[in-house]
Amino acid sequence: MRRVVCLGSPLHGSLVARNLGRHRATAWVLGRSRALLQGGCPPWQGQARVGVVAGTVARGAGRLLARFDGPSDGTVAVAETRLPGLADHCVVAASHTGLVFSREAADQAAAFLRDGRFAPVAAAGPYNRA
């Protein structure tokens, strides 16, 4: 596998997961992925080029479980999707669940899989490229 695209993945760990993990009544939701979701991944050093598409429409239940300091998709903060060693990173206007239905996210994923980088964003804002 040469290229991988992650959609809204909290590669750097998840505040929502850390908050869920604090209580026995909700920690079970995280299952066997608890440690990874709470702590994040080590810097990427694998052979495949990895790109992340993050969302910036803050909708979803995650807003009830965490207060994000910066932009988020309502479940995962944009900052939580960044990880040293990524080949590229971009953001689109979508919620966490909306990323899988977003035409812009699909177009960006296709560009990364084809070219190894995300397409330039027409209206570049402070969070559009990393």
Question: What label would you give each PLM region?
Answer:
Residues 1-51, 65-68, 73:
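Serine-dependent carboxylesterase/thioesterase catalytic core
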Residues 47-130:
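C-terminal catalytic-base region of ester-bond hydrolases, centering on the histidine
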